[in-house]
């Protein structure tokens, strides 16, 4: 596989202290205007600790890291071996911090983008049967 390089500029970072929050960099603070507590957002993260040539070549994984699950393409899983979108609920906004319940990312993970998540446009009816066959 040959990869073409391009640059992604982080707009903030995941922080895990007493609370979990997204710290938006000062130069992107204006982009938070209109975001309200209770809004759902979609985060685009860069799993910087999984960014190696070897891990980038992984295209199939066992979901949930369980070898009893069949090998599945990474785009059909939540594997951390490439950038993943996550959805979290905004609980509180203070200055350049967006507080959230939890996130499956490490402290210091770069946030590439944040988008409002209007359910009526982005959330099709859930079909839980497609993942119910997988083992945790």
From Swiss-Prot:
PROSITE patterns: TSAA_1, TSAA_2. Keywords: S-adenosyl-L-methionine. CDD domains: UPF0066. Pfam families: TrmO_N. S-adenosyl-L-methionine binds at residues 48-49, 78, 106-109. SUPFAM superfamilies: YaeB-like. Residues 8-126 form the TsaA-like domain. The keyword S-adenosyl-L-methionine applies. Belongs to the tRNA methyltransferase O family. This is Probable S-adenosyl-L-methionine-binding protein PH1056. It comes from Pyrococcus horikoshii (strain ATCC 700860 / DSM 12428 / JCM 9974 / NBRC 100139 / OT-3).
